[in-house]
Each structure stands twice: as C-alpha cells, then as structure tokens.
Amino acid sequence: MVMNSGKWFKADEFKCNCGKCGLNTVHPELIKILDRARDHLGTPLRINSGVRCGPQHTDYNGQIGGAKNSMHLPQGDDLIGFGVDITYSQSAKRSPLNMTRLWMALEDAGRPIKLGLGLYPSWIHVDVRGLLGRGEARWQDKYFPWPR
C-alpha cells in the first residue's frame, strides 16, 4: 500500500481506526489542502478520522454509523480515501469561532477543487469530492453553536 504524508501530516494519522485493515492512504491533493490550512492557521491540527474500511474489511465506517457513500471509504484500485475529519490538537482551541476559522482556512486552501465541508461542534469534515466529478457540498451539524 502506498504511504503518504505531507509537511505537517504523516501517513499514520490517516489510518483506519479499526486497527485491523491496514488502510491509511488518502488522496495527495487532500494532504496538500490540510498542509496549506495548517500553515495559514499556524497551530497544530489533528486528524480524528481518516480513511475508513467498509464491508470488504471490518466495516469500521458502518460500525460508527458513517454514510454508505462516505468520502472516507476507499475509492478505486488504489484504495485511497477522499475525506477526513480534522480538528485542533489542543481542545482549548475548539471554540465555535476557531472551528469557523478552520472551516474558512480549509475552504481557501482547497480552491479550485470542489470540496465537501461539514461543520461540527468540535471538528470539520473535509473531502475532495470534486476530484471524483462530484459537485461541492456544505453542511453543518444541527448542534453547531455559531459564534456571536
């Protein structure tokens, strides 16, 4: 399996959390976006969830209630993931204002690729769905407290 890493993120951070399947590769364009966002923010970020195995392995994605068409699931012959969930390494930085800043940094870093961006109270989902010919998508968790 091809290992991948960037300036700030290493292959081990993208591995499936099932601990059994060995999947750990995400699209290199996604890693570039994450690195650019990290450079912009100037603070450490952490991958909560990288590639996730599906029914062909231990079905970690299904076990955690992930979408059947999740961008975390391996795509193509290379079995690479196209999405990750990311947050700040320091929990004190996970305020609504900072989560919004992370969202904006990812959106800027991803141009011109059509991204999927999901805003949650303590993490952001980001994927490079445009590389699969899909349109961009934006959503927010109903519990996200917009900064005032």
Placement of each model-derived feature along the sequence:
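Compositionally biased, low-complexity repeat tracts
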Residues: 2, 15, 46, 58-62, ...
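Extended, low-complexity, intrinsically disordered C-terminal regulatory tails
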Residues: 31-66
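Active-site acidic/histidine clusters and adjacent loop/turn architecture
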Residues: 1-44
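Catalytic cores and adjacent binding grooves of peptidoglycan-active enzymes
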Residues: 68-84, 88-148
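Solvent-exposed, flexible loop/coil residues
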Residues: 13, 18, 55, 64, ...
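Short amphipathic alpha-helical surface micro-motifs
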Residues: 28-30, 60-63, 106-111
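Helix N-cap and loop-to-helix transition residues
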Residues: 10, 27, 53, 95-98
